[in-house]
Structures are given as C-alpha cells and as structure tokens.
Amino acid sequence: MNETFIPASDYKKKNWCLIDCKDQKLGRIAVVISRLLSGKQKLHYHPAFDVGDYVVVINAQDMIFDSQQPRFSVNVPGRPGRLLKQVINALPSQLLMTAIYGMLPEGSAKKSLPKRLKIYNGPDHPHAAQNPIKLDEFI
C-alpha cells in the first residue's frame, strides 16, 4: 500500500500576495488570482488540502474590460420595466469576483477560497501589516 508523505508544516504557511490591476485585462488577472487562491503554483500542491494564499487586489477600477460586449446587471429581476445597469462602470470589483469564482475548481472548497480574496478599487489597502508580496512578473 502506497502512502503519500504530507509535510504538515508546509500546508499551514499562507503568503499574502499583492496584485495591481492597473492597465491589465480582466481574464489574465482572473487566471493568475484563481491559481494563487487554489495554491497550484506551490510545489506541495494537493487538491485535498487547502494550500492557497491570500490575495489582495488593488486598482480594480482601472482594469481593461472587453468593450465589445457590454455586460448588464438586472436591478429588479422578474418585473416588467426592470432596470438594467452596466456592470463595467458601476461594479468593477463585482465583475472581477464573478470571473475569479467561475475559474475556481468545483467542490466544497469553491465557497471557502474567495474568502481569502480582498478586492479594493483604489491603490490603498489595510493589509500592510501582513507584508504582501507584490507580484508583477506573473502578469
């Protein structure tokens, strides 16, 4: 019977990563963030264990969206005369969160992984005490 060696100390370490979304495309950023949240970039990745990192995203309002496909959100669903508003101009952080959530793997971890994601529209964030690592080379 084969037994997999699992180093317990490596699974408990969670790094804080900082990603600047200024002048970056939505899909490219979402792929990088989903890989960081699930921990697939680590050498000791295992799908049964939670080995992902915390991710802080800044400048979400300055992302580049696909302008050819306007995205709308229904404000009052199921009623005649419902209001449609463009999601791109109103809620850039919500659009990023939806894209990342769709790229996460299916299963019970899909609900817990977005809890480690912090999205801010401006350049300021309250997580300076965690010393996040700025990731520019992955994007």
From Swiss-Prot:
Gene Ontology molecular function: any one: mRNA binding
Annotated localization: Plastid, Chloroplast
Gene Ontology BP terms: negative regulation of translation; translation
Coiled coil residues, start to end: none
Top-level taxon in the UniProt lineage: Eukaryota
Ribonucleoprotein is among the record's keywords: yes
Signal peptide residues on this chain, from the entry's feature table: none
Keywords (A to Z) from UniProt: Chloroplast, Plastid, Ribonucleoprotein, Ribosomal protein
Family, as annotated: Belongs to the universal ribosomal protein uL13 family.
Protein name: Large ribosomal subunit protein uL13c
Organism the protein comes from: Trieres chinensis
Gene from which the chain derives: rpl13
